Curated annotation (Swiss-Prot):
PANTHER family according to UniProt: LIGAND BINDING DOMAIN PROTEIN, PUTATIVE (AFU_ORTHOLOGUE AFUA_6G14370)-RELATED, QUERCETIN 2,3-DIOXYGENASE-RELATED
Keyword set, alphabetical order: Virion
Entry-linked Pfam families: Cupin_2 (PF07883)
Protein name per the record: Uncharacterized protein L612
Record's GO cellular component terms: virion component
Lineage per the UniProt record: Viruses, Varidnaviria, Bamfordvirae, Nucleocytoviricota, Megaviricetes
Cell location: Virion
Protein origin, superkingdom: Viruses
InterPro entries for this protein: Cupin_2 (IPR013096), Flavonoid_dioxygenase-like (IPR052538), RmlC-like_jellyroll (IPR014710), RmlC_Cupin_sf (IPR011051)
Listed Gene3D superfamilies: Jelly Rolls
Amino acid sequence: MISNQNQVYVVNVREETLKNPYYRRVIDTSPHQQLVLMSLKPKEDIKFEIHPDNDQHIRIEKGTAIALTGKNKDTKHVLTEGMCIVIPAGTWHQIINSSNTDYLKLYTIYSPADHPPGEIDVRRPQSGGSGSKTGDFKNKYYKYKYKYFKLRSSVPRELN
């Protein structure tokens, strides 16, 4: 089930995360947050990135990950099933699947949204595609277009 509405969204996030076959799948987007499922191949990573305007919460549902944080990747955190990491806006970070054989299954919550609603990346993007680089126009465009339409739909019709 995918939701791109400003409505209450109920899902068994563990079940959906474990069965997600895609590198990245956006399943819920609201004006203030976004729920994204991810599946990383053995030794695959989420690129070293920074979200200037987004807080990010990452929870590991299956597997073991290494989280590197800081401009110089100077802090290392080992994350196992059931653990989470909360990354404040403006913090450099990278998530790495530490397994040689098993997929890493995780979900992440961005606040505010960081990817176009409903986006699915079957494989890890090779260049850009993270939505986190300041020059990434496409993702910023969709992010603010979505916010604009949500705001516009909340204004009484007689004022439109």
